[in-house]
Amino acid sequence: MPHEELPSLQRPRYGSIVDDERLSAEEMDERRRQNIAYEYLCHLEEAKRWMEVCLVEELPPTTELEEGLRNGVYLAKLAKFFAPKMVSEKKIYDVEQTRYKKSGLHFRHTDNTVQWLRAMEAIGLPKIFYPETTDVYDRKNIPRMIYCIHALSLYLFKLGIAPQIQDLLGKVDFTEEEISNMRKELEKYGIQMPAFSKIGGILANELSVDEAALHAAVIAINEAIEKGVAKQTIITLRNPNAVLTCVDDSLSQEYQKELWEAKKKKEESAKLKNSCISEEERDAYEELLTQAEIQSNISTVNRMAAVDHINAVLQEGDPENTLLALKKPEAQLPAVYPFAAVMYQNELFNLQKQNTSNYLAHEELLIAVEMLSAVALLNQALESSDLVAVQNQLRSPTIGFNNLDEAHVDRYADALLSVKQEALSQGQDTLSWNEIQNCIDMINNQIQEENDRMVVLGYINEAIDAGNPLKTLDTLLLPTANIRDVDPDCAQHYQDVLFYTKSQKLGDPKNVSKVLWLDEIQQAINEANVDENRAKQWVTLVVDVNECLDRKQSDHILTALKSSPSNIHNILPECANKYYDTLVKAKESKTDNESSEGSWVTLNVQEKYNYYYNTDSKEGSWVPPELCLSKESWLTGEEIEDIVEEVTSDYIREKLWSASEDLLVRFEATTLGPALREEFEARKAFLYEQTESVVKIQAFWKGFKQRQEYLHRQQVFAGNVDSVVKIQSWFRMVTARKSYLSRLRYFEDHKNEIVKIQSLLRASKARDDYKALVGSENPPLTVIRKFVYLLDQSDLDFQEELEVARLREEVVTKIRANQQLEKDLNLMDIKIGLLVKNRITLEDVISHRKKLNKKKGGEIEILNNTDNKGIKSLSKERRKTLETYQQLFYLLQTKPSYLAKLIFQMPQNKSTKFMDTVIFTLYNYASNQREEYLLLKLFKTALEEEIKSKVDQVQDIVTGNPTVIKMVVSFNRGARGQNTLRQLLAPVVKEIIEDKALVINTNPVEVYKAWVNQLETQTGEASKLPYDVTTEQALTYPEVKNKLEASIENLRKVTDKVLGSIISSLDLLPYGLRYIAKVLKNSIREKFPDATEEELLKIVGNLLYYRYMNPAIVAPDGFDIIDMTAGGQINSNQRRNLGSVAKVLQHAASNKLFEGENEHLSSMNNYLSETYQEFRKYFQEACDVPEPEEKFNMDKYTDLVTVSKPVIYISIEEIINTHLLLLEHQDAIATEKSDLLNELLESLGEVPTVESFLGEGAVDPNDPNKENTLNQLSKTEISLSLTSKYDVKDGEAVDGRSLMIKTKKLIIDVTRNQPGSTLTEILETPATGQQELEHAKDMESRAVVDSRTPEEGKQSQAVIEDARLPLEQKKRKIQRNLRTLEQTGHVSSKNKYQDILNEIAKDIRNQRIHRKLRKAELSKLQQTLNALNKKAAFYEDQINYYDTYIKTCVDNLKRKNSRRSIKLDGKAEPKGTKRVKPVRYTAAKLHDKGVLLGIDDLQTNQFKNVMFDIIATEDMGIFDVRSKFLGVEMEKVQLNIQDLLQMQYEGVAVMKMFDKVKVNVNLLIYLLNKKFYGK
């Protein structure tokens, strides 16, 4: 890759042949080649940077660019850049390069290069520059392609489409290694380097007449520039043939200077490059400025002049002039907005002043104007109070705000609206960038404070609940809590008050919140502080008063009572003595128990809390002391208060009576009262008698006065009409404004409540609409319109679909790879076993090992068909064959009857292989819901067919081995159900295996033999017990019965655990297995109506437990239930434990009791019966599952509306075999001549060969291993995009359902843009121009989304054409379709076509379900892939383990001492340096020890003449035993300690040696251990 300004890197060394260094010819040639490589790397870097600018995308490093361009993706993207009408992104093959990264180049990558060449041809680039397709794809001449890119860049620059390519020669550095590598590459391909310097001249020679005139004009400009006369230069620039724009005569001097400098620079660069080239060979444009370069320099001068003008205008301070200057195209600045002219002026002027040079460069203006324009749009949105627009503007990347959190954009917008209103009220039109940023920072701080306070709120509530005062105090003192006036001394009281407050809140049912909020906590703290002050005041009063009484200071009592700010009011100085005397008397009455009193004064506050004060230490506390003895002799606060109030009230009462004594006397003496009352009553009686007259007089007088006032007021109004009108208008205005401002203040004061109410209303409305959509039988159109957007397919939908497709491919590929690897490993296991038994040679094993490693390492090369003659070649005939195969497999997928019949037409061995490979491959191993749905339909059809034709009795399902049941179990125990079995059984199985102390053996004879072996092994003496016993005899021994009972108890406990795991995990059971169990039960009931429920459930149990779970329990290592290391295995005890559990569960599932030979286990029969009841309920619930149509939300029309076509990955061999089988059994599976299957098979013709499938030339005909190569290539997988032969392609529906789907899409498009309460109203109302425009925009947006859709996910051409129709034409087409649908009975105009609206509502509901299911499928596929990867890793460990074993064998073969034993760690047993002495015994001695039991045809007294020599061999565990009779060697046998241990494990007590010597196996093992192993 290029590096800039690094001294350690290399640049080329140019020079003449005569140099000071006096180089040799070889050295000069070497330097020339190095310079060529460097120049070519520079051209690569130039092309890379130019393409990155055009594509706005990063390209591979320079040294990797050639390889990165071979797939043509970047070239096709470049073609899309300069010829977008010819090349679209959807036409670019492998646009994301996922296939290229995964499996390298594919022949279809050449399509990208062809599109690039055609695009260059379309814009008129001379073909002399074009490379060949093979130059790019096969890397035959990559420099030619780079040469073409340079020519294209210059051509596009002249057309004004692309920027000019840079000249980087001598400006970038490369390491010596990079230059050398490039030189070697160029030499390797023998490529002649193109003349990059002559591109300009060649383009000029290829120009038309008009372009020749352009060439002449450009030369004239260059000559004028050379002369240096500005006026002459401006004349040549004005020449129309030069096609130059924006030439300003006033800038002639600047043009001359800029162009002259550019020309001199180019001449110097040309001289440097062409020092060794003759002038005849040079290109004219190497020294002359091209038209594009001249235009570029003119634009540069214009831009500089425009920037100068902008800086000058900013100094003048006129916003309008500033706006005009910014708008000039020569300035090359972003768009500006007139309404923000003042802001541009002020902000840019301030920015100019901050600059040290008092000048803004173009780059600074570019950034500033772009940001200010974004701020202007934001201010505009704020003025219109458009929250959505404000939020969108805040998200704009050009505005560049810091710390903008997407989640809080709505709060920013609300805050900015408030700030904007305040600014407008103060006369400020726009908010500056800094003001907006400050507002954002303020909101961020508020949010942070709120979050912090919520956290600390939780801490405080937790501390309150914990009841720890110190912890509560710590949380209250946290700075983020912001709790005021917290006194550490009051910690206990704070805890008490807060706990009481929270308890009250919890007890109030009206309170929804069950925590204390910060305002409630602050209120409680304030209340506690008040309590503290009150308590201290009372303590001061009590102490002062009691001390005053103790000291008998009567003159100080008034001061003590007044100085304490307590609740005692109206303390009168006149009563001082009375206070003192009364208090003394009260205190004297309490001094009886003075000797036993303490020093504590207790004060009760609010009748809830106690405050404790120590009179000795003068300290108070809310915490109860350990020993609280009250000071009984002192008066309490309440007593003092009562006494003072009583004395004061007595005194006041006495004074009141004294003051009122004279008044009472006078009142009693007066006699005026009765006379006045008598006079008043007389007057009232008179008026009552004259009521009518009084009323008339009053009415007349009031009317007269009112008329006088009205007439006077009328005269005043008549004389001041204008004033009256003005006053009235002002009053109305003031009243309205007051009402408005009052309402506004009310809204401001209740903003939070208003927002909540609005949110609740919107939410309620949305809920009502959703309920109507979901729950209503006939949802109205107005509701449906609100939710139709949910039917849109987003980019995320397409990405998820692609990811699902990718994972499906990976899962299917990994399953097949693991299956093949497992077969090879099993074969390897067998071969190693045969090696151990000496049945095959080590060379055979090594040969298979090489094949295995070759597969594991992926060394088998899968050939790509690049000769355009294979099944996927671009020929019409091959394409038709491919499409027919795709239609054939689609038919087999969707019509299960064909495969169901085919399965039963084949022999058992062929059908099993067919099911394991072709069928599961055809359904992608049910890697998605569609395939799982279809596979279940096949299972159902095949199972019903098998039961109908092959099952004669109910028990045949249990006793036989039904093909479909075997297929279902095999599938659900495979990759799809493996995780289920692991989750279901792994924990309990692992627990059983890891329990080393667990021993379950329910065979009495085995228990007996193990007991006898144990006795003999421990004692070393022969047991007196018999070795061969029956079950009944074994059970007579108490030891055996005890061990058996212990085993049964252990068995019951362990079985409970396994049963519990199974019963509780019903939901984990695969749906497919449960559904087939349901089908099995219903099919059996249908064929055998007399079968009882018990019989049916036993059959279900046979499927679910015996066939599916039982083998996994017995052999968990074989079904990947537990993880096993390579070479690891389950020992015999563990396997027996698992087998015992499985046996009990099997009996329980079939409700079979222990009888007959298992009579000794009859104690478990009650347990079996109870367990069966649990199983019975489990089997019933297992069958309670919905139909696949409901479960997967699918039907036969689902494929018509899915985003992507179904794809399967199948090998060539499987395609050929399937084709062959279909032809072989065609008459049986497609009986009707008009059957579609017959039509497809007829189209395909004969079964093709592998070679014809791959295409001619795929295999060398002279290859001696042609057959092996073809066999290997037949396993090559290809992808088939399945399609129906009768897909709708011509725009006409084949049935009412398809027409319904098309009509629904059209209705959805129309209802988006045209309002109306019913469909009929919309269709009858003409669309406005605005609605047509909005509809066109929507369709354009959809077309953009569709353009990014992968080919396999694109909709049919008919649907696309319908989408392009104008609104009115769509409505007419809807009306036609609705009439057709009404004739077929699908809709009715009587209910205003509500049926089709109901279908749309159903689609909306199902879309959410589909997305949810797709996410679940993604997760499920990922889990399956992870499990498969783990399994593959285990197989690789197994391969490595076998490698170690075989390598050890090879190493040992190379040694001369082949007799030494082989171990898996590669180490041989050390060869002894001394000969081992034999152990010698007479037969009589061995007989005495109990080892030897007898010798055939020899008396016991002759045993002393028989001698046995036992010799340890060099092989570990192997012993030679020689026998001698009377000193003569008779025979020799070899003992293997492993064989003896196996016999002991199997319970064999006696064995024969030399065919006549009977020995005790247990005692022989004991003897060998003692003599040779010291144990």
UniProtKB/Swiss-Prot annotation:
Q: Which residues form the Ras-GAP domain?
A: 933-1182
The record's Gene Ontology cellular component field reads:
cell surface; cytoplasm; filopodium; lamellipodium; microvillus
What InterPro entries does this protein's entry cite? Answer: CH_dom, CH_dom_sf, IQ_motif_EF-hand-BS, RasGAP_C, RasGAP_CS, RasGAP_dom, Rho_GTPase_activation_prot, WW_dom
Domain Calponin-homology (CH), chain residue ranges per copy: 41-156
Provide the WW domain boundaries.
Answer: 594-627
Molecular function as annotated in GO: actin filament binding; Arp2/3 complex binding; calmodulin binding; phosphatidylinositol-3,4,5-trisphosphate binding; small GTPase binding
- Post-translational modification Phosphothreonine, affected residues: 356, 782, 881, 1002, 1269
> Locate the IQ domain: which residues?
690-719, 720-749, 750-779
Under the heading Pfam families, the entry gives:
CH (PF00307), IQ (PF00612), RasGAP (PF00616), RasGAP_C (PF03836)
User: Where Phosphoserine occurs, residue numbers?
Assistant: 16, 595, 599, 1279, 1461
From its record, what is one biological process in GO terms?
A: Arp2/3 complex-mediated actin nucleation
Q: What does this protein do?
A: Binds to activated CDC42 and RAC1 but does not seem to stimulate their GTPase activity. Associates with calmodulin.
What is this protein identified as?
A: Ras GTPase-activating-like protein IQGAP2
